[in-house]
Amino acid sequence: MLDFVKLMMGQDPKPVRALVEIYTKQASSACIRAKWLLCHKGVKYTEYRIDQDELAAITMVDRTGGRRDLPQIFINNQHIGGDSELDRLNREGELDHLLAEVYNY
C-alpha cells in the first residue's frame, strides 16, 4: 500500500535487490509479522526454519552474536535484528533503502 501511495505521489518505490535472510520457527507471531512485511514489500527472502534444522539454529546464534529470539533478519549479510527492528526501519523509511542496495556476491 505504501508503495502505491508513493507511486501516486510521484515517488517510485525502489526495486528490491538485496539479499534477505530470515531465521524463523513455525507458529511464531513475530516471525509471521516480519515475513508479512517483507512479502508486502515484494521481497524474496531465504527462510531458515530453526525448529526443523539444527544447523540453521547453530548458525543463527553464531551470526547474531548469541541472540536466540526470533525472527532474526539479515539484509546483505548485515544483521538487522528481529521484527521490532525491522518495523522500526520501515517506519523510519530506512528499510526501502537497505532493500534497494545491490548485494555483491
Regions found by a protein language model. Give the residues of each.
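Non-catalytic, surface beta->alpha helical segment in thiol-disulfide oxidoreductase systems
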Residues: 75-105
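Post-cleavage N-terminal segment of exported redox proteins
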Residues: 2-4
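Generic recognition of short, well-ordered alpha-helical segments
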Residues: 32-36, 59, 84
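Local sequence-structure signature of Cys/Sec-based thiol-disulfide redox active-site neighborhoods
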Residues: 6-46
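Short beta->alpha junction loops/turns
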Residues: 27, 50-53, 78
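Thioredoxin-like thiol-disulfide oxidoreductase module
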Residues: 50-68, 94-105
